[in-house]
UniProtKB/Swiss-Prot annotation:
CDD domains: DnaJ, DnaJ_C, DnaJ_zf. GO terms for biological process: chaperone cofactor-dependent protein refolding; DNA replication; protein refolding; response to heat. Residues 5-69 form the J domain. GO terms for molecular function: ATP binding; heat shock protein binding; unfolded protein binding; zinc ion binding. Its cofactor is Zn(2+). Belongs to the DnaJ family. The J domain is necessary and sufficient to stimulate DnaK ATPase activity. Zinc center 1 plays an important role in the autonomous, DnaK-independent chaperone activity of DnaJ. Zinc center 2 is essential for interaction with DnaK and for DnaJ activity. Participates actively in the response to hyperosmotic and heat shock by preventing the aggregation of stress-denatured proteins and by disaggregating proteins, also in an autonomous, DnaK-independent fashion. Unfolded proteins bind initially to DnaJ; upon interaction with the DnaJ-bound protein, DnaK hydrolyzes its bound ATP, resulting in the formation of a stable complex. GrpE releases ADP from DnaK; ATP binding to DnaK triggers the release of the substrate protein, thus completing the reaction cycle. This is Chaperone protein DnaJ. It comes from the Bacteria. A zinc finger (CR-type) spans 133-215. Homodimer. One of its GO terms (cellular component) is cytoplasm.
Length: 377
């Protein structure tokens, strides 16, 4: 076995954080838990996951594993003589010895309360909903505390008992013959699966897990000014905890749908509109849509294509509460594609009055004239 296999068992990279390792362990152990997964090989897979987490979940063991592989994580190297090192089985383990002298220990209490897993939910918002804020009711399934046994995993009227194999420690000693000699290591108890307790009579609803899948709904207040990718954390709306631990959190991920009128970057809203060349040349007052309603915009004479105007305060709210953004309006001067004789003559007169050389457009052939005639029908 190389020093990558434990990471592969949990589905994480070698540079994963302890939080990522813990979440991966919870997800994988739940998937292959023998009380839930009855497929052949599930129990063996569960044991492999437990073995990997026993090492990677401990910083010191993980460091030794990364450097020396499993032999380093499981207690060091022998001299080849078969000597297995100090047998701590009669003393409750090194952690218990240090705990009795110094009031602490490095081992994890298998019965300690643990927070449940976090969940994610993606919610779609209309453009205006993201600008002004809204309230959404989201529906999803989550692992909740079993309503029959209240999360104990035991049949009502019964209680879990101390594991008969590990005596409540959650781990057992295992001797392994290696090329370096006999080695003793601690592994997760295969009877209680690390909880330190046995359930003699499992709950008929959750089959001993203490959890059941339930439909859940919660109302989410979306603040004004949110953008795609931002998250809203709802504490305690995730999955049920373990050993009486609190529920995890729900992270609502925002996805803002595109508008057929506007574009947005932060608190600034962008809008493009067409004006004709007469408006551009002589100036005009036009009506412009905004998310706050229509407003009038003065187009000065001589406006060119690409000119951008700012409508102050007509953008989106700034999420941190610092007022409103602006709306930028970019104009596109549209050149007419078809002119009648009067319009052509007027433009020719304009060209002469402006000192512009006479325009001599290419005369149309017979087929182009026929095509124009059909277009006008």
């Amino acid at each position: 076995m190389n020093n990558q296999e434990y990471y592969d068992r949990l589905g994480v990279s070698k540079d994963a954080s302890q939080d990522e390792i813990k979440k991966a362990y919870r997800r994988m152990s739940k998937k292959y838990h023998p009380d839930i997964n009855k497929e052949p090989g599930a129990e063996e897979k569960y044991k492999e996951i437990q073995e990997a987490y026993d090492t990677l979940g401990d910083e010191q063991k993980r460091a030794a594993y990364d450097q020396y592989g499993p032999a380093g994580a499981n207690g060091g190297f022998g001299d080849g003589s078969g000597f297995s090192g100090f047998d701590s089985s009669g003393f409750g383990g090194f952690e218990d010895i240090f705990s009795s002298f110094f009031g602490g220990g490095a081992s994890r209490n298998p019965n300690a309360p643990r927070q449940g897993d976090d969940l994610q939910y993606r919610v779609n918002l209309q453009f205006e909903e993201a600008v002004f804020g809204t309230e959404k009711e989201v529906h999803y399934n989550r692992e909740a505390s079993c309503h029959t046994c209240n999360g104990s995993g035991a049949k009502p009227g019964t209680s879990p008992v101390t594991c008969s194999k590990c005596h409540g420690s959650g781990v057992i000693n295992m001797d392994t013959q290696t090329p370096l000699g006999m080695m003793r290591r601690q592994v997760t108890c295969d009877v209680c699966h690390g909880t330190g307790q046995e359930i003699k009579e499992p709950c008929p609803t959750c089959h001993g897990t203490g959890h059941e899948k339930q439909s859940h709904k919660v109302s989410v207040k979306i603040p004004a000014g949110v953008e795609t990718g931002q998250q809203i954390r709802l504490a305690g709306q995730g999955e049920a905890g373990f050993n009486g631990g609190p529920y995890g959190d729900l992270f609502v991920i925002i996805n803002v749908l595109k508008s057929d009128k506007f574009e947005r970057d932060g608190s600034t809203i962008y809008y493009s509109m067409d004006i004709n060349f007469v408006q551009a040349a002589l100036g005009d007052t036009v009506e412009v849509p905004t998310v706050h309603g229509n407003v009038e915009l003065a187009i000065p004479a001589g406006t060119q294509t690409g000119k951008t105007f700012r409508l102050k305060g007509k953008g989106a709210p700034r999420l941190r509460g610092n007022g409103q953004g602006d709306q930028h309006v970019t104009v596109n001067v549209v050149t007419p594609t078809k002119l009648n004789d009067a319009q052509k003559e007027a433009l020719q007169d304009f060209a002469k009055a402006s000192g512009i050389n006479p325009v001599h457009p290419k005369k149309k052939g017979f087929f182009n004239k026929v095509k124009d005639a059909f277009d006008e029908m």
